[in-house]
Amino acid sequence: MTLKKLNLHLVSDSSGETVISVAKSALKHFRSVETIEYVWSFVKGEEQIDKILEEIERKSDEHNFVICTITDDGLRKYLKDNCIKLKIPYRAILSHIIREISSYLEIEKDEKLDLYTEINNEYFQRIEAINYTINHDDGQNIQDIDKADIILVGVSRTSKSPTSMYLAYRGYKVANVPFVSEIPFYVDLAKLRNKLTIGVTIDVRRLIEIRKNRLTSINNEGNNIYADPRKVEEEIKEAEEFFKQNNWPIIDVTQRSIEEVSATIIQYFNKI
């Protein structure tokens, strides 16, 4: 298969995360495209756009595509008009949404937004969430577990850690605690009151498969308990009963991606 090459110019008046995310989602549908991404962040004036256009002109014999999330109408029009002159495909992905909301609610959009401060606050909130989550992985530092936004509880190998880190990147402080069969739960349940605590479960056969693979990867196939079908089934049953006793929502992660599981957790969080 011959790969087609595309220079993708992602233009934003903020950090560029939105336009990058949208572009990645779109490009997943084109495995035959080799993409070079040019991210132009914090674009606030025509001079910056002129530099972008100069870069595009230097590659005029190649395939170029512009996607932007500039919210300033005048600046966005300046970019669009010049892309038309250069015969470069151009798409704005926020302006239509903003316009539709404005029209539907019959209100004008806010013109003066301190986006720089907002972005800085989001950045530091995310860093704080990531640090908290790393320090509260696998039952560590439970003395201040009540500072978590979300607590995940589940038996070993139920994707608690990767799910926690994904949520942390979204700005949530997450603690995850292992549930170990026949051992008393060592977290003070009083600290979990009024906190979103999720019980994580999985299909028995799938967990056995995951645990066997784990034992193989660490050359410990001789462990007859960790992946024993009867023990695993009892462990999951005991965990689920414990979750129900505490009225915690239960999420089955069998054959579900980290993104899907996280989206469900965020839905629960938004209902609090």
From Swiss-Prot:
| Catalytic class of the enzyme | transferase
Question: Which positions does UniProt annotate for ADP binding?
Answer: G154, V155, S156, R157, T158, S159, K160, S161
Which GO molecular-function terms appear in the entry? ADP binding; ATP binding; phosphotransferase activity, phosphate group as acceptor; protein serine/threonine kinase activity
Q: In this record, what's one Pfam family?
A: Kinase-PPPase
**Keyword Nucleotide-binding included in the entry's annotation:** yes
Chemical reaction(s) catalysed: N(tele)-phospho-L-histidyl/L-threonyl-[pyruvate, phosphate dikinase] + ADP = N(tele)-phospho-L-histidyl/O-phospho-L-threonyl-[pyruvate, phosphate dikinase] + AMP + H(+); N(tele)-phospho-L-histidyl/O-phospho-L-threonyl-[pyruvate, phosphate dikinase] + phosphate + H(+) = N(tele)-phospho-L-histidyl/L-threonyl-[pyruvate, phosphate dikinase] + diphosphate
Question: What are the protein's UniProt keywords?
Answer: Kinase, Nucleotide-binding, Serine/threonine-protein kinase, Transferase
Domain of life assignment: Bacteria
- EC nos: 2.7.11.32, 2.7.4.27
| InterPro entries found in the cross-reference section | Kinase-pyrophosphorylase, PPDK_reg
Functional summary from the UniProt entry: Bifunctional serine/threonine kinase and phosphorylase involved in the regulation of the pyruvate, phosphate dikinase (PPDK) by catalyzing its phosphorylation/dephosphorylation.
The entry sums up its family as follows:
Belongs to the pyruvate, phosphate/water dikinase regulatory protein family. PDRP subfamily.
Q: Which HAMAP family match?
A: PDRP (MF_00921)
Q: What is this protein called?
A: Putative pyruvate, phosphate dikinase regulatory protein
- What is the organism field in this record? Wolbachia pipientis subsp. Culex pipiens (strain wPip)
